[in-house]
Swiss-Prot record:
This is Large ribosomal subunit protein bL20. NCBIfam families: rplT_bact. GO terms for molecular function: rRNA binding; structural constituent of ribosome. Binds directly to 23S ribosomal RNA and is necessary for the in vitro assembly process of the 50S ribosomal subunit. It is not involved in the protein synthesizing functions of that subunit. GO terms for cellular component: ribonucleoprotein complex; ribosome. One of its GO terms (biological process) is translation. InterPro entries: Ribosomal_bL20, RIBOSOMAL_L20_CS, Ribosomal_protein_bL20_C. PROSITE patterns: RIBOSOMAL_L20.
Length: 115
């Protein structure tokens, strides 16, 4: 069987991790063993939070729409039900943006939902 020499493999593997750990504080960014643990943790957090971000933004949009809807005298659930009945195809992100940037237009949308 042929002899296998590792060459640069180990250094490349370590440098890949240390590149990912650049900017971490202290030994977490310079020492391979701690950097490896921190990078694995960071990647787990990133994976989890990419999914959490979607939930958080949806909650934010709903809170903004609800606040603006109540100013116009209707609850969030009645507003969304009315919009569905009126076949208004605005998603929550668009409604929240409308409520913040242009309250007058949002009032017109609420009037449409009220029927």
């Amino acid at each position: 069987m042929a002899r296998v020499k590792r060459g640069n493999v180990a250094r490349k593997r370590r440098n890949k991790i240390l590149r990912l750990a650049r900017g971490f504080r202290g030994g977490n960014g310079t020492q391979f063993r701690t950097a490896n643990q921190r990078v694995m943790k960071a990647l787990c957090n990133a994976y989890r939070d990419r999914r959490r971000r979607k939930r958080d933004f949806r909650r934010l949009w709903i809170a903004r729409i609800n606040a603006a809807a109540r100013i116009n005298g209707v609850s969030y659930s009645r507003l969304m039900g009315g919009l569905k009945k009126a076949d208004v195809r605005l998603n929550r992100k668009m409604l929240a943006q409308l409520a913040v940037v242009d309250p007058g237009s949002f009032s017109n949308v609420v009037a449409t939902a009220k029927g």
